[in-house]
Each structure stands twice: as C-alpha cells, then as structure tokens.
Amino acid sequence: MIPIGFLSFLFAACEDYVPVPKPRAFPRVIYPEKVYQPFKQTGCNFSFEAPGYAVIERDSTFFEEQVRSDCWFNIAVPSLNAKIHCSYYPITGRARFDELVQDAFTMAQKHNIKASFIEEIPIHRPADHVHGIVFAIEGAAASSYQFFLTDSTENFLRGALYFNTQARPDSLAPVLAFMRKDVNRLVETLKWE
C-alpha cells in the first residue's frame, strides 16, 4: 500500500504551470562597417569626412520655408534610422557670431525638459582654426548629440543627431554610441576652406 503522505505529495506536485512573462526584447541591429570618405559640397567653405554608408541629402525646407543656405544638408544613415542635420552660416560680424553661439546653446538647452544631464565638451583645434562645443545630452531627449564648430570670424556649422523613432535611452544606447563616433569623426576632420 502506498503511504498517504506520498500520495498527497504527488497531488501537490501536479499543479498547473504558471507562465512567467518573457523579458522584452528589441530587434537585432546590424551595424555597417566603419568607413569614411571625404565630403566637400560645392560652394561651401568646409570639408570633412563622412560615413561611407551614409547618404548626404540637401536640405530643402526649413519649417515650410526655403532653406537659408545651399550648405544645409542631412547626413542620413537609413540602416540605423538616424540623421545628422547640419546647418552652415556665414559670420557677418561679432553680433552675428554671438547670436549663432547663443542659438546653439538655446537649441541644446531646449532638450532640458527630457534630459537628465547635458555635458558640454569643448573643441579647440587651433592649427585648423576650428573651435566649438559638442553637447552630449543624456536621457530621453529627441536629440542626444549636438555640436557647433566655428573659426569665430567667417564660418559657423551647427549639427544635431536625431533618430526617427521614439526616444528610449536604454534601447538606443548602442546605436547612439555607434553614431556618436561618426559625429566625432566629422568634428575631428572638419577643415575650413
């Protein structure tokens, strides 16, 4: 005869399986191989190295108006759903220079609502007359990386990295790290003509 304790153990062990939800997963990202090529736009006073896997798109509208310069363009990386929006301005005087710098800071600070931290990284390359600031924006901001570069007398270039997706810092972190290297390469290789 089977002991009653053993039978009660068997009945207790046969309870229904309680499913546990699987952790949320994100699609696998295939990163392109890091290759850079020279970029020089006719009529623009600068050159730099752009990713070889990017598509350079001339910007055609600015808030439903014509763009202010032929040197406004986007560096699009379709495989990562990312764009670096670049705007070039000629400096016509000290007041204009101050206005452009203030605008760059204002544009970066607009992300303070969602940002948890904004790091300002100074850029000084005196040999190439390139100076500026890179804004590394942490948190769920729409643009996580922005910059401006200038020679402080004639040329001013502003750029901002955007992803065509909802800002999710944790899931975007690897792609953001990949794209930051491309922005840094642009900043490191920019030369005024």
Model-derived regions, located:
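Sec-dependent bacterial lipoprotein signal peptides
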Residues: M1-D16
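N-terminal targeting sequences that direct proteins away from the cytosol to non-cytosolic compartments
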Residues: C14-N81, T92-F105, Q109-K110, A115-P122, ...
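A short, hydrophobic, proline-anchored segment that marks a local hinge/packing element in signaling
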Residues: Q146-S152
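Generic detector of short alpha-helix boundary/capping microenvironments
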Residues: I2, T42-G43, F147
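Short, Gly/Ser/Thr-enriched beta-strand-loop segments that form substrate-interacting elements
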Residues: H131-Y145
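A short gly/proline-enriched turn/hairpin at secondary-structure junctions
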Residues: S87-Y89
